[in-house]
UniProtKB/Swiss-Prot annotation:
It comes from the Eukaryota. Belongs to the 14-3-3 family. This is 14-3-3-like protein. It comes from Pisum sativum. Pfam families: 14-3-3 (PF00244). Coiled coil: none annotated. PROSITE patterns: 1433_1, 1433_2. InterPro entries: 14-3-3, 14-3-3_CS, 14-3-3_dom_sf, 14-3-3_domain.
């Protein structure tokens, strides 16, 4: 007879099913239950990756919607279609409300449970990076004092993660590289500091290249993928500084086996 599964194991399995079915809101719910079942115990690498993938997909869909609606709003404004603009603004604020709720949910979980229970260097960096990411997503659409506050919280999260990463993780570690990638995107997009963005991305890339021969087979693929994204952004940003282009900036993407 098969051994009885704990509620925690059952919820992990349900989260994987929800991921396969691309039902990410439910995946979030299952992983929040896993976190609750864990009490003060740390999540496993698999569990934290599933949680990250779930939230990244839920927030990613709304971020994409917000960008599309904002673009349409700008076009309608330039055409002077005030009636349309008013309708679009209402719709945009609905999406922004959803974005805020999602970010508030994961940030609360990070502050109350995930960060306090993190014991290893890589899990601390993972969660602090995540904290920076979700404050950055708030900074993308907030304005005025709220945007300033979100940007400051992003910087605090990323800097805390960077301090631990530099001290405890090798330059080739996928989580350290993913942090550098997203931190540099923050400098470029939110703080409008292309020089700082390029310096951070270049330093992370160069340090990783210097130690590439120490990479194990396990993380080689993950690390080299993020290094490629760092290089893509550097190429894009240096050409942007010359001709003000607007191609797509790359961020660390969620993966089930190794989450950046």
């Amino acid at each position: 007879m098969a051994a009885a599964h704990t509620p925690r194991e059952e919820n992990v399995y349900m989260a994987k099913l929800a991921e396969q079915a691309e039902r990410y809101e439910e995946m979030v719910e299952f992983m929040e239950k896993v976190s609750a079942n864990a009490d003060s115990e740390e999540l496993t690498v698999e569990e934290r990756n599933l949680l990250s993938v779930a939230y990244k997909n839920v927030i990613g869909a709304r971020r994409a919607s917000w960008r599309i609606i904002s673009s349409i709003e700008q076009k309608e404004e330039s055409r002077g279609n005030e009636d349309h603009v008013a309708v679009i603004r209402d719709y945009r604020s609905k999406i922004e409300s959803e974005l805020s709720n999602i970010c508030d949910g994961i940030l609360k979980l990070l502050d109350t449970r995930l960060i306090p229970s993190a014991s290893s260097g890589d899990s601390k960096v993972f969660y602090l990076k995540m904290k920076g990411d979700y404050h950055r997503y708030l900074a993308e659409f907030k304005t005025g004092a709220e945007r300033k506050e979100a940007a400051e919280s992003t910087l605090t999260g990323y800097k805390s993660a960077q301090d631990i990463a530099n001290a405890e993780l090798p330059p080739t570690h996928p989580i350290r590289l993913g942090l550098a990638l997203n931190f540099s995107v923050f400098y470029y997009e939110i703080l409008n500091s292309p020089d700082r963005a390029c310096n951070l991305a270049k330093q992370a890339f160069d340090e990783a290249i210097a130690e590439l021969d120490t990479l194990g087979e396990e993380s080689y693929k993950d690390s080299t993928l993020i290094m490629q994204l760092l290089r893509d952004n550097l190429t894009l940003w240096t050409s942007d500084m010359q001709d003000d282009g607007a191609d797509e900036i790359k961020e660390a993407a969620p993966k089930a086996d190794e989450q950046q």
